[in-house]
């Protein structure tokens, strides 16, 4: 299976640079995964396609302000007690990728040439000091931090949101890169399908008798890593940490046993429950790391339907949705979305891949 099979032409102006003021006011393309039929709506109309007994699976990870801007410092002979460092002034950017024990983080450091083992970096005039202690897979650096106080509070003060590479400017309100149900800190990128939900919409859905289950997968920057290999089977997926609690696994399994559909909000929720599923198709209470790569030919163990954003050409996320609805249906739907001027990627519009399109009058 070739990477080019998942190419579509996307005009640059359709890449959304800012979120809409109304989260649930984005557009929604509904795709019947069996027939390829497409209808157009406003996202809040998703309720038309949900029913009592369905289970909506959310990823409640929380994006941390993982982008740190600092300066390299060099050891100097102490000139006075307590003054053993001098700033060299070389700007260094750190992206926190994965937390390790003992205040150590796996990071991406720019510029990499300056990031040798032993390098020390000052953030916020010394409020936070990082020392590179090792070089690991893909050239990432392990950095040990020293500080006074609470790390999360310092990070909230000094850090910036690590927006996707196709977003060209900082957000005025960094909370718009969080879902309203974000809870467990650890992601370097948002599970963006969830950005369309408001608390009011979630309550409306729950009041319909739809079960809401929460899982956690901390999204890494690897989610933006392009597929470089021509044969997608040669691609190696990045690793991401996930957790499914027993109470949430029970909600999903009970809904499945009762004949309800399992509807994931986002590809991260999908990858989580598929990673935690046993051979009988039931979700286990489990935590660990997953490198699951879902592409056409994959047989879903748990998932029935998917709410997702529009993804990059030739990306692993586009391959995942093609596994659910077929490459032909997905590419055709994407081409129609381009024609209809949908907004793409993280701050863009949404798609609901379902199996029971009901005839409704198009909103547009």
Curated annotation (Swiss-Prot):
Its EC number is 2.4.99.17. It is found in: Cytoplasm. It catalyses: 7-aminomethyl-7-carbaguanosine(34) in tRNA + S-adenosyl-L-methionine = epoxyqueuosine(34) in tRNA + adenine + L-methionine + 2 H(+). Signal peptide: none annotated. Its main location: cytoplasm. GO terms for biological process: queuosine biosynthetic process; tRNA wobble guanine modification. Pathway: tRNA modification; tRNA-queuosine biosynthesis. It holds the Pfam family Queuosine_synth. SUPFAM superfamilies: QueA-like (SSF111337). InterPro entries: QueA (IPR003699), QueA_dom1 (IPR042118), QueA_dom2 (IPR042119), QueA_sf (IPR036100). One of its GO terms (cellular component) is cytoplasm. GO terms for molecular function: S-adenosylmethionine:tRNA ribosyltransferase-isomerase activity. It is an enzyme of class 2 (transferase). Keywords: Cytoplasm, Queuosine biosynthesis, S-adenosyl-L-methionine, Transferase. Belongs to the QueA family. Transfers and isomerizes the ribose moiety from AdoMet to the 7-aminomethyl group of 7-deazaguanine (preQ1-tRNA) to give epoxyqueuosine (oQ-tRNA). Monomer. PANTHER family: S-ADENOSYLMETHIONINE:TRNA RIBOSYLTRANSFERASE-ISOMERASE (PTHR30307:SF0). HAMAP family: QueA. This is S-adenosylmethionine:tRNA ribosyltransferase-isomerase. It comes from Lachnoclostridium phytofermentans (strain ATCC 700394 / DSM 18823 / ISDg) (Clostridium phytofermentans).
